[in-house]
Amino acid sequence: MAATAATTTSSHLLLSSSRHVASSSQPSILSPRSLFSNNGKRAPTGVRNHQYASGVRCMAVAADAAETKTAARKKSGYELQTLTGWLLRQEMKGEIDAELTIVMSSISLACKQIASLVQRAGISNLTGVQGAVNIQGEDQKKLDVISNEVFSNCLRSSGRTGIIASEEEDVPVAVEESYSGNYVVVFDPLDGSSNIDAAVSTGSIFGIYSPNDECIVDDSDDISALGSEEQRCIVNVCQPGNNLLAAGYCMYSSSVIFVLTLGKGVFSFTLDPMYGEFVLTQENIEIPKAGRIYSFNEGNYQMWDDKLKKYIDDLKDPGPTGKPYSARYIGSLVGDFHRTLLYGGIYGYPRDAKSKNGKLRLLYECAPMSFIVEQAGGKGSDGHSRVLDIQPTEIHQRVPLYIGSTEEVEKLEKYLA
């Protein structure tokens, strides 16, 4: 009985709507004629005919409500944004081109391979020294050599890299012509490798530039025999940090963290071991304006100049607050910088009596890290000037580095002035 009544009522409503539409001087909104005015011109887009039947109005309102509900759908807790997907979105927005997307993907692949090697170093007998010395005069660890090969091979196979410059190479290396591309990539394949044997945090650092000129140096060339053209090529590879298109680092620790900037904010991705993909975990990272943490190797204190000693002594003084700065030092630039980026404070590797120009390399350590910290709202300085403004004169040029929260770096600069 109730079903019959419902059917009758429904039929009655439909019949009433039909009669209303038929008697109206205006066409129904469901009719194609409703898209045009009386003189045959098309009505403006988005304008509705409000003189339609009440039954049609109910249908439209229901449709609008359904659309709103769909738009307000909550993001699934299982929805992951991978580094590859994120890069493709940046490409679609015009932030980067397809070439740079491929280069970045190649770098992320190299980082995954190195992460695996680091995690299995003790098992695979990859600890200890290689028995060779690099251009810096440093004993090469086994993983230094292997990581450099991994990075170089991934960049060569991308087909989008023209020149690569590494901490472990004497000179910039031109990628074979059949595989060469447009980008210059500088990198430290394994920063903090002295920590490998103790399973302490290490990392890889990279920066990407557009080329100023074509490099013709081959990896078989003897640097002492280079002519004027080759030397000019090296100078052209040495670009200031202001020219960086992208920079980042990958930290190999309790988790594998890939931090990246394309010049518009800093983003962090964590390697998911289940899927083997870097997953977006932090967006638009901002370093605190100040932080009561300093990260210096105080073993070199006696070799520092008096101004820097005074600065460090004052940090240790409790002062009116009764709370001195906390000292934190890992011995890995990537590890110490990552903590500073998240918690605030200052990291420093100054010049001293032994290292007149400091120890860190400008092109592939100081400049990329300074680019990242500035994108996060911090500051990178050599104690007197902005790191990104320094024009390198050689591939392995060293400079002092003070990097971190803006207020902390500016405070140090006043001491050193």
Swiss-Prot record:
Its EC number is 3.1.3.11. Pfam families: FBPase (PF00316), FBPase_C (PF18913). One of its GO terms (biological process) is fructose 1,6-bisphosphate metabolic process. Mg(2+) 2 binds at residues 167, 188, 190. Binds 3 Mg(2+) ions per subunit. Residues 1-59 form a transit peptide. Residues 24-48 are annotated as: Disordered. Its cofactor is Mg(2+). Mg(2+) 1 binds at residues 138, 167. Changing residue 361 to K: In hcef1; reduced growth rate, dwarf phenotype and delayed flowering. It catalyses: beta-D-fructose 1,6-bisphosphate + H2O = beta-D-fructose 6-phosphate + phosphate. The keyword Signal does not apply. One of its GO terms (cellular component) is chloroplast. Its main location: plastid. One of its GO terms (molecular function) is metal ion binding. It is found in: Plastid, Chloroplast stroma. InterPro entries: FBPase_C_dom (IPR044015), FBPase_class-1 (IPR000146), FBPase_N (IPR033391), FBPtase (IPR028343), Fructose_bisphosphatase_AS (IPR020548). Disulfide bonds join 233-238. The keyword Cell membrane does not apply. Catalyzes the irreversible reaction from fructose-1,6-bisphosphate to fructose-6-phosphate and inorganic phosphate, to regenerate the primary CO(2) acceptor molecule, ribulose-1,5-bisphosphate. Involved in the regulation of photosynthetic electron flow and sucrose synthesis. Its activity is critical for normal plant development and important for the regulation of a wide range of metabolic processes. HAMAP family: FBPase_class1. In plants there are two FBPase isozymes: one in the cytosol and the other in the chloroplast. This is Fructose-1,6-bisphosphatase 1, chloroplastic. The gene is CFBP1.
